C-alpha cells in the first residue's frame, strides 16, 4: 500500500509541535517534487533520490528544520541547496520570501518547473555557490541549508544572517542551530543527528 499524506502527517505529529509547519507539509504536494518513478513513495517519511546524486530530504527533517527556524510570515529566507525545490516550497508556504541557491543548473531548472506546477510563488532561484549565500538580498531572517558542511558553517552564511535571525545547517552528521542576538553575537546549539549530501563549493561541473 502506497504511503498517504494523512499517514505521514499523523507520523510527523508525534515529533513536530508547530501546527503551521505540519499544515505546510500537508499542503505542499510532495509528489510534484520527486521524479515520476518515485511518486508512489512521495508521502513516505524518507529521503528519495532526485537525480544528479541528490535527494529530496526526509519530511521529518524538513519539518524539524522549519520548526527550528521559526519562520514568520513575511520573513526573508535564504535556502541553500535547492535540489527539487521542496524545502523552498515549504518555507514559502509558511509565508516567507525565499532566495534559493543551487550549484547545478539542471536541478535549478527542474526546481523552477516543480515550483510552478505546485503553484508556489515568492521563491527566487539562483544558480551559484551556496557556500557564498546570496549577498544581494541579505540580510536574512532565516538561513536554511539542506547540505552538510564538512567542518564549520560557511562564514558568508553567518555574515548574511540578520540580528534576531536563525540559521540551521548540518555540519558533519550533526544539525547545528545558530542564532544572532540583538547585539549581533552568534550562539550555536546542537539540534540532533542527521545525514545529508555534502555541501560542495563552486559551480557544478559541465
Residue locations for each model-derived region?
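Class I SAM-dependent transferase core
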Residues: 1-78, 86-90, 94, 107-117, ...
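Conserved nucleotide-cofactor-binding alpha/beta core module
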Residues: 70-187
